[in-house]
């Protein structure tokens, strides 16, 4: 198996100048309504649960 079997959106990074390295998260805040990572980011419960009800 080689890397051409799957498209995983991988990029090559050079150790000399870190070319090709860039953040993939473009949101200013991960604590937005509907954010699936809200609980992991310790957001307020109302935001972290995305309006879902448990019970």
From Swiss-Prot:
Modified residues (2,3-didehydroalanine (Ser)): 29
Post-translational modification: Maturation of lantibiotics involves the enzymatic conversion of Thr, and Ser into dehydrated AA and the formation of thioether bonds with cysteine. This is followed by membrane translocation and cleavage of the modified precursor.
Database matches in Pfam families: Gallidermin (PF02052)
Localization (cell): Secreted
Main location: secreted
Propeptide part(s) removed at maturation, as residue ranges: 1-24
Keywords: Antibiotic, Antimicrobial, Bacteriocin, Lantibiotic, Secreted, Thioether bond
Lanthionine (Ser-Cys) cross-link, chain position(s): 27-31
Cross-link (Beta-methyllanthionine (Thr-Cys)): 32-35, 37-43, 47-50, 49-52
Highest taxon, organism lineage: Bacteria
A Gene Ontology molecular function term of the record: signaling receptor binding
A cellular component annotation (GO) from this entry: extracellular region
Matching InterPro entries: Lantibiotic_typ-A_Bacillales
Modified residues (2,3-didehydrobutyrine): 26, 42
GO terms, biological process: defense response to bacterium; killing of cells of another organism
Function description: Lanthionine-containing peptide antibiotic (lantibiotic) active on Gram-positive bacteria. The bactericidal activity of lantibiotics is based on depolarization of energized bacterial cytoplasmic membranes, initiated by the formation of aqueous transmembrane pores.
Family according to the record: Belongs to the type A lantibiotic family.
The protein's name in its UniProt record: Lantibiotic nisin-U
Organism, scientific name: Streptococcus uberis
Encoding gene per record: nsuA
